[in-house]
Amino acid sequence: MNSLSYLNQDQQSFPPPEQALSDPNGLLAVGGDLQPERLLNAYYNGIFPWFNQDDPILWWSPDPRAVFAPGNLRVSRSLIKYLKKQSWTFSINKQFPAVIRGCAAPRAKQEETWISDDIQQAYLSLHQQGHAHSIEVWEDDILIGGLYGLAIGQVFCGESMFHLRTNASKAAMIVLQQHLLRCGFKLIDAQVENPHLDSLGAKSIKRKDFLTLLKHLRDGDVNPDSWLTTEVPIEL
């Protein structure tokens, strides 16, 4: 039987993801901190933090894992028709702080957000170091949606998305996967399956298969200009 590991401030390494609990699914370790080195080590090994505001830091590696292959996003005809009617524009890394704040904002039927001030600061640090990135959706000069995540080699680890207009987060996802495909990325890690991701074509794969893919792709090369701040198109 697997047991939960407890991390201290000086312990940068994680136990193998295969040692994660089955209930709750994927819980691997407790404790540690959110310093950039630890976070990068976690994602490099298929582990991510997820915890509520007043909880200790919890580290996860669930089985199965939700993933996308760039280019395999499921886009319905009705969504394409809807998006063609909009005059939205899209950008990369133009307003990362605003995107993560948008993702952290309370949502309907949700009493609290897991994206605490500490989480926001941690990922802002990763963004400043060139590891965390955002996609923005604009209506004129108003930010109406977006998403953020981390780039680990040829893998993009999606963290969260938000929308203030119908389908704006889906538009951000379309822009992201088209951009990743152009830049040489091979996999989008969506972490935990849910109906929204399933509707977009996410696939659930066994953790061992995900870890095999990750080990193959995490040191791979992509376009070095992938994350320059710029406007990007959407192809419908």
Curated annotation (Swiss-Prot):
For this chain, one GO molecular function annotation is: leucyl-tRNA--protein transferase activity
Answer whether the UniProt record assigns the keyword Transferase to this protein. yes
| Catalytic activity as recorded in UniProt | N-terminal L-lysyl-[protein] + L-leucyl-tRNA(Leu) = N-terminal L-leucyl-L-lysyl-[protein] + tRNA(Leu) + H(+); N-terminal L-arginyl-[protein] + L-leucyl-tRNA(Leu) = N-terminal L-leucyl-L-arginyl-[protein] + tRNA(Leu) + H(+); L-phenylalanyl-tRNA(Phe) + an N-terminal L-alpha-aminoacyl-[protein] = an N-terminal L-phenylalanyl-L-alpha-aminoacyl-[protein] + tRNA(Phe)
Q: Where in the cell is it found?
A: Cytoplasm
**A GO CC term attached to the entry:** cytoplasm
Q: Which top EC class is given?
A: transferase
SUPFAM superfamilies referenced in this protein's UniProt entry, alphabetically: Acyl-CoA N-acyltransferases (Nat)
Q: Which GO terms describe its biological process?
A: protein catabolic process
Pfam families recorded for this chain? Leu_Phe_trans (PF03588)
Organism's domain of life? Bacteria
Q: What is its EC number?
A: 2.3.2.6
Coarse class of the primary localization is cytoplasm
List the residue ranges of the region (Disordered): 1-22
Q: Look up keyword Transferase and say if it applies.
A: yes
Give UniProt keywords alphabetically.
Acyltransferase, Cytoplasm, Transferase
UniProt lists compositionally biased (Polar residues) regions at 1-13
Q: Which PANTHER family match?
A: LEUCYL/PHENYLALANYL-TRNA--PROTEIN TRANSFERASE, LEUCYL_PHENYLALANYL-TRNA--PROTEIN TRANSFERASE
Q: Which family does it belong to?
A: Belongs to the L/F-transferase family.
User: Briefly, what is this protein's role?
Assistant: Functions in the N-end rule pathway of protein degradation where it conjugates Leu, Phe and, less efficiently, Met from aminoacyl-tRNAs to the N-termini of proteins containing an N-terminal arginine or lysine.
Protein name in UniProt:
Leucyl/phenylalanyl-tRNA--protein transferase
The organism named in the record is Shewanella piezotolerans (strain WP3 / JCM 13877)
Write the lineage as a comma-separated list: Bacteria, Pseudomonadati, Pseudomonadota, Gammaproteobacteria, Alteromonadales
